[in-house]
């Protein structure tokens, strides 16, 4: 197919490619940007985003979350953030969680958090770009971008507009999900964005009575996907009702467990001492 010169919706490299990169405002400083993506919804991508931000914050890094899931935002709920966004001159001030994570989400701009966002793709992508350029991100070591599922307008906008240093791909054990995850991995490869690793959510369930592990959603294909693309497996999250309860109650910053440590170590390696 011939070139339409619409570079904003194209993932191919060519000599006539336009520069869609967006610059931060002069007040902001963000050292590293990590995208958290999934091929489909319902795999726990926002949970993983929250756990990554908290894990890095516990290591002493300054963290932020740009909630790019405009039509399905859940980050404010997970962190117990309710206050509306304020402005400082021409820039917006992100909300700050109990332990210091900066958060920008469309839910913090709506009159009611239950109000739907009924926008077309280009408008949604534009809003995500503004969350990068028009927010005062103060001295952030690691920003995590909670992407909407799939490979549509918003992931393309983020990959083209933001200086993404790498992505974490979230999946679950089901075979169909594994196939869709490969689409997300291949999109990142097409866009020359490094895939830092894979995280499998709902990997196994440990019976509280007998202590045996059960593969509730079937046998995992994670290792085969990782081997095919030469990507490390960074974490396997167990099914833990406590984690779901903490997401719902806004206390994700209080989670316990070391299952995210390999992922945190991989991300920390991006920032020289």
Indicate where each model-derived feature is located.
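Phosphate-binding loop that captures ATP/GTP phosphates
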Residues: 62-63, 68-113, 125
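Glycine-rich phosphate-binding loops of nucleotide-dependent enzymes
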Residues: 104, 128, 147, 160, ...
């Amino acid at each position: 197919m011939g070139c339409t010169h619409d570079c904003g919706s194209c993932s191919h490299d060519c000599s006539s490619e336009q520069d869609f990169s967006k610059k931060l405002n002069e007040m902001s400083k963000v050292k590293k940007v990590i995208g958290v993506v999934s091929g489909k919804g319902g795999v726990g991508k926002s949970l993983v985003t929250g756990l990554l931000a908290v894990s890095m914050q516990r290591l002493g890094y300054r963290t932020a979350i740009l909630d790019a899931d405009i039509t399905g935002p859940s980050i404010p709920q997970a962190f117990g953030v309710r206050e509306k966004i304020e402005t400082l001159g021409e820039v917006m001030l992100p909300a700050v969680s109990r332990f210091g994570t900066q958060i920008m989400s469309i839910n913090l701009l709506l009159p009611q958090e239950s109000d739907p966002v009924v926008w077309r793709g280009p408008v949604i992508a534009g809003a995500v770009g503004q969350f990068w350029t028009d927010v005062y991100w103060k001295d952030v070591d690691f920003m995590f971008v909670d992407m909407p599922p799939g490979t549509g307008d918003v992931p393309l906008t983020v990959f083209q507009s933001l200086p993404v240093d790498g992505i974490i791909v979230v999946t679950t054990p089901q075979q169909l999900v594994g196939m869709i995850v490969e689409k997300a991995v291949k999109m990142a490869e097409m866009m020359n964005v490094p895939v830092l690793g894979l995280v499998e959510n709902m990997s196994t369930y440990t019976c509280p009575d007998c202590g045996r592990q059960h593969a509730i959603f079937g046998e995992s294909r994670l290792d085969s996907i990782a081997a095919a693309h030469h990507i490390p497996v960074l974490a396997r999250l167990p099914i833990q009702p406590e984690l779901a309860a903490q997401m719902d109650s806004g206390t994700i910053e209080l989670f316990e467990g070391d299952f995210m440590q390999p992922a945190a170590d991989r991300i920390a390696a991006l920032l020289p001492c």
